[in-house]
Regions:
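Repeated scaffold domains used in trafficking and secretory/extracellular systems
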Residues: 10-20, 49-59, 88-98, 127-137, ...
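Short loop/turn segments that connect beta-strands within the blades of beta-propeller domains
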Residues: 1, 19, 30, 58, ...
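Residue position within the beta-strands of beta-propeller blades
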Residues: 24-26, 63-65, 102-104, 141-143
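Blade-level signature of beta-propeller repeat domains, shared across WD40, Kelch, NHL, RCC1
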Residues: 129-177
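Short loop/turn segments that connect beta-strands within beta-propeller blades
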Residues: 1-3, 37-42, 76-81, 115-120, ...
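Intrinsically disordered, low-complexity segments enriched in Gly and acidic/Ser/Thr residues
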Residues: 66, 86-113, 117-134
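Structural motif
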Residues: 30-36, 69-75, 108-114, 147-160
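A short beta-strand motif characteristic of beta-propeller blades
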Residues: 4-9, 42-48, 81-87, 120-126
Length: 177
């Protein structure tokens, strides 16, 4: 009967990041501002009136795709109210953690790249279009766009990658059932 459920929003939100009981997301209706929802009170506040997509909060920084500037990758300092451009390349997706940012460059020379979380030392991990970038403390995992059956992984901060056979084998075993 849904009597124990509370509607938090009457429109779709992208809960891109959650930290200490706060969900951060960008606007999808009238603007692309950064919003925060306190999960204890269900209260929503505007954090920053930027034009951003897919915000990820790490410490004092909000990493995001800059909608106004062709989806380049930036970070915003919450305490200093300052924007830093990490790359001017147009990106499709990214993830950040453990001192690194992994991101998919869009365009004719599409590739998966890595940089330090301050924007320094970028390098190519793999040529082509990749998505579903996930990180652990030791590895980054990703898939080639359009191929849901294969996963790849790379030791965090390295320049090499390989097929993650355990994921492929689990998928094949599931198909046999």
């Amino acid at each position: 009967d849904k009597s124990d459920k509370t509607e938090l929003s009457n429109f779709e939100i992208n809960p891109a990041s959650a930290v200490n009981g706060t969900i951060y997301y960008n606007g999808t209706q009238d603007n692309h501002y950064l919003y925060a929802m306190n999960t204890a009170t269900d209260g929503v506040s505007t954090v920053w009136d930027g034009n951003l997509w897919y915000p990820i909060v790490q410490g004092d920084y909000v990493y995001y795709m800059d909608v106004e500037n062709d989806y380049r990758l930036c970070r915003y300092s919450l305490s200093r109210n300052e924007i830093e451009v990490l790359t001017n390349e147009r990106i499709d997706c990214f993830n950040v953690g453990y001192g690194y940012v992994y991101y998919q460059v869009n365009g004719e020379e599409a590739c998966l790249k890595c940089m330090r979380d301050d924007g320094s030392d970028s390098w190519v991990i793999a040529e082509g279009n990749y998505t579903a970038i996930n990180m652990t403390s030791q590895y980054v995992y990703f898939q080639m766009f359009g191929d849901d059956s294969s996963w790849y992984h790379s030791p965090l901060g390295s320049q090499s990658y390989s097929v993650f056979d355990a994921a492929r084998q689990a998928a094949l075993d599931a198909l046999k059932k």
